[in-house]
Design a protein with these regions (language model features):
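Active-site anion/phosphate-binding pocket segments in diverse small-molecule metabolic enzymes
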Residues: 1-184, 188-191
């Protein structure tokens, strides 16, 4: 047996012996082999995205005033003061996805996250409350979002040849939602 790291080996012409179990979730869902992060022909690297709602967006100082300590997660805040930035708070947090595994849209940067919220420097983008921001996910963010008890998972067929998975993350007691929306997993026979 093996996992996504064994995919190239299993598909090679080498004598692999008898393989009876390969867990290929990362390769299939994210469209990459895991040793060298090469794209797998016929699969999409953007099959699943995470969409989070803006719940606050203001121009603020990049650092708070006063003494700055580590976060609740043991991380030190950024040392560089970048002056005023377009700071945006999103309704998605560490309990929903691994922030280190999210790739923000061009011109935006993830600054940090609490259990319930993600802080984003929106750059030159002026975002309004209620707008949605779409992120690409790595395996760590995907696993956390799909196994989170705060995320509902729904499988939808986009077309006859493409399958989509939609996941909705909703914080307890909040009306805002974060959504993982795939754009396609490639062709799946018989779908």
């Amino acid at each position: 047996g093996g996992n996504s790291a064994n995919l190239d080996w299993a598909l090679s012409d080498a004598d692999t012996g008898r393989i009876n179990n390969l867990r290929l979730g990362e390769s299939i869902l994210l469209g990459r082999e895991t040793l060298h992060r090469r794209v797998i022909d016929g699969l999409h690297t953007d099959a699943i995205t995470l969409v989070a709602e803006v719940i606050e967006s203001k121009v603020k100082q990049s650092q708070p005033q006063g003494e700055i300590a580590q976060t609740a997660f043991g991380e030190k805040p950024p040392a560089a003061n970048r002056g005023h930035i377009s700071q945006t708070i999103l309704a998605i947090g560490r309990q929903d996805a691994d922030p280190r595994g999210l790739r923000s849209p061009p011109g935006m940067e993830i600054l940090g996250a609490s259990s319930d919220h993600l802080i984003l420097d929106a750059g030159d983008h002026r975002l309004a409350v209620g707008e949605e921001i779409t992120f690409q996910l790595n395996y760590s963010a995907l696993v956390r979002s799909m196994s989170s008890p705060f995320v509902a998972k729904v499988l939808k067929a986009k077309s006859r040849d493409t399958t989509m998975v939609t996941a909705i993350a909703s914080a307890i007691g909040e009306s805002s939602q974060a959504v993982a929306q795939p754009t396609g997993l490639g062709s799946i026979p018989g779908s």
